[in-house]
Amino acid sequence: MSVISMKQLLEAGVHFGHQTRRWNPKMAPYIFTERNGIYIIDLQKTVKKVEEAYNFLRSVAEEGKDVLFVGTKKQAQEAIEEEAKRSEMHFVNNRWLGGMLTNFTTITARINKLEELDKMEEDGTFEVLPKKEVIKLKNEREKLEKNLGGIRKLDANNVGAMFIVDPRKEKNAILEAKRLGIPVVAIVDTNCDPDEVDFVIPGNDDAIRAVRLIAAKMADAVLEGRQGEQLAE
């Protein structure tokens, strides 16, 4: 049984690539044909590549390592958050802050600040502070939550893989992963460079349904791997 079927991929529109004038020639092996000025992705290859990525992420989770889900474009934000939470993993879906992995000490300080502001809100500190001050602190908290909420519990040393939607948009995340030797799994559209990615999943990175389908399969892989890890214990 394949991890994913051609029918599922077709229904989610995974086969629609970008316009032919916006393409990366390195994606040629994954292109099936061209229709009305748009490249059509070879879904037989996608089926195979989803399977490879699935098996890899499952083995990462089996080893007790974490997977960081990254997708900051509008079409990916919701699916990235939901699927990361479902598989009890970490995510970045608003903005990749420079040094998120390579300068984790600074990021940790900001996460601590977020925790501190949460505590102030919970223990009633906000109620005794001047209104102006509270508004300022609440705005700061909101901004930190937006950018760092998904990595609050992250241990940067335990990231075994990164799952990315659109490597072109997330080039900074990829650079940091490369520097730290973290393998990257990504949905790669016809306008991206597949050489930047360790596990290429050729597919449409602009359709919400397509992104959700593949992100869900990657989360399933993590869940299956975690089950295996528990059984091994």
Swiss-Prot record:
Coiled coil: none
A GO molecular-function annotation: structural constituent of ribosome
GO BP, sorted A to Z: translation
KW Signal (keyword) present: no
A GO CC annotation given for this chain: cytosolic small ribosomal subunit
CDD domains with a match to the protein in the record: RPS2 (cd01425)
Pfam families per record: Ribosomal_S2 (PF00318)
Alphabetically ordered keywords of this record: Ribonucleoprotein, Ribosomal protein
Family statement: Belongs to the universal ribosomal protein uS2 family.
NCBIfam families registered for this protein in UniProt: rpsB_bact (TIGR01011)
Protein name according to UniProt: Small ribosomal subunit protein uS2
Organism of origin: Clostridium botulinum (strain Hall / ATCC 3502 / NCTC 13319 / Type A)
